[in-house]
Amino acid sequence: SLHAPSALVLTVGHGESAATAVPLRAVTLTCAPTASGTHPATVSACAELRGAGGDFDALAADAGVMCTREYAPVVVTVDGVWQGRRLSYERTFANECVKNAGSSSVFTF
């Protein structure tokens, strides 16, 4: 195929690290050749990831969202392949609101 594969599994769980957090939800996100998967916003999430060059730390936070300072940590993991390269990512957010505001759509699941 002309497109290198981009297929990811994203999970979210309560806790400070993926080693101890039990996954509450898991979604799939495939971005090539077309956007698909169980992620609730495949097209926008793929567009956002392409814009960030597949760098999850480069995703822009949604500036319009105000979150409480409550500390109820959630951890997001991403594993799979992005444009043919293996990828494994983990990030902890202070709470669910902060997670959802951490990107436009990638972490909103």
Curated annotation (Swiss-Prot):
Summary of the function given for this chain in its UniProt record: Strong inhibitory activity toward subtilisin BPN' and, to a lesser extent, toward trypsin.
Protein name (database record): Subtilisin inhibitor-like protein 7
Xref: PROSITE patterns: SSI
Disulfide bonds: C31-C46, C67-C97
Keyword line: Disulfide bond, Protease inhibitor, Secreted, Serine protease inhibitor
Organism expressing this protein natively: Streptomyces ambofaciens
Disulfide bond as UniProt keyword: yes
Subcellular location(s) of the protein: Secreted
A Pfam family reported for this protein in Swiss-Prot or TrEMBL: SSI
InterPro entries registered for this protein in UniProt: Prot_inh_I16_SSI, Prot_inh_SSI_I16_CS, Subtilisin_inhibitor, Subtilisin_inhibitor-like_sf
GO cellular component: extracellular region
Family of the protein in this entry: Belongs to the protease inhibitor I16 (SSI) family.
Site description Reactive bond, residues in chain: R69, E70
Lineage: superkingdom: Bacteria
Subunit relationships: Homodimer.
Annotated GO MF terms: serine-type endopeptidase inhibitor activity
